[in-house]
Amino acid sequence: MGLSDGEWQLVLNAWGKVETDIGGHGQEVLIRLFKGHPETLEKFDKFKHLKSEDEMKASEDLKKHGTTVLTALGNILKKKGQHEAELAPLAQSHATKHKIPVKYLEFISEAIIQVLESKHPGDFGADAQGAMSKALELFRNDIAAKYKELGFQG
């Protein structure tokens, strides 16, 4: 399920847009995740108290965590599928410490695509969306394989 060179280029072009305001994009991704799937908020002790979208938008901690999430994902995407070194510690922490199910990674993938679609409609058409979906699916499949190695049934 690899991506072609052209698809990777579409992914990296879109990611370049994210990096122009990684904190803003990250915050919006997390807000969409928490609003669309409130159960995911339970995995974040630091953010459980944030009940409204306004509270989430005002949270510097949420913005910082969004930056952390998208920076890590960007480092993985830039490896164009050759991301074993970057993925292993992420899978380890998400399986053993945070206990994040793969389903939640599907939810955040949807949120990432929605944010890119809304913030960059002219630069994130059907081809770019399809390529990003494939890249995020590759990431999730590889995380799921690592989870299995670690004995986490997430």
Swiss-Prot record:
The keyword Protein biosynthesis does not apply. One of its GO terms (cellular component) is extracellular exosome. It catalyses: Fe(III)-heme b-[protein] + nitric oxide + H2O = Fe(II)-heme b-[protein] + nitrite + 2 H(+); H2O2 + AH2 = A + 2 H2O. Gene3D superfamilies: 6.10.140.2100, 6.10.140.2110. The modification Phosphoserine is found at residue 4. GO terms for molecular function: heme binding; metal ion binding; nitrite reductase activity; oxygen binding; oxygen carrier activity; peroxidase activity. The modification Phosphothreonine is found at residue 68. It holds the Pfam family Globin. Residues 2-148 form the Globin domain. Heme b binds at residue 94. SUPFAM superfamilies: Globin-like (SSF46458). It is found in: Cytoplasm, Sarcoplasm. Monomeric heme protein which primary function is to store oxygen and facilitate its diffusion within muscle tissues. Reversibly binds oxygen through a pentacoordinated heme iron and enables its timely and efficient release as needed during periods of heightened demand. Depending on the oxidative conditions of tissues and cells, and in addition to its ability to bind oxygen, it also has a nitrite reductase activity whereby it regulates the production of bioactive nitric oxide. This is Myoglobin. It comes from Ctenodactylus gundi. The gene is MB.
